[in-house]
């Protein structure tokens, strides 16, 4: 099941932190971004296997792995060995970068294994809120 939400952005741009997209990609597709994204991106693997290329390094994505990409970081990712299922969120805001840096995300980060329970719960809450905006 693929579910993607790109909220209509209006007055949210004045907020210090705002959602620009959230989704479940099942299956995930081959993505090449030579100039990176304009937004910050968090992505975690909920099933299958994929590959992420940042710079000259390749990172294997398996269930429980996650990565963070700040804006403008060139990257490529694609499924490997069949299906790859991802949960992802993209966001912007004047203070998004500073907030993330204060949390230790001051550049590209990759983790081969995270405890997915809390991130999945948070992701599901954000997805539910984005599905029924109060705008």
PLM regions: where:
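A generic short alpha-helical patch detector that favors 3-5-residue windows
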Residues: 14, 88-91, 114-118
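Alpha-helix boundary/capping detector
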Residues: 45-48, 78, 90, 115, ...
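Short C-terminal domain-edge/linker segments immediately following a structured domain
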Residues: 50-56, 74-75, 83-84, 98-101, ...
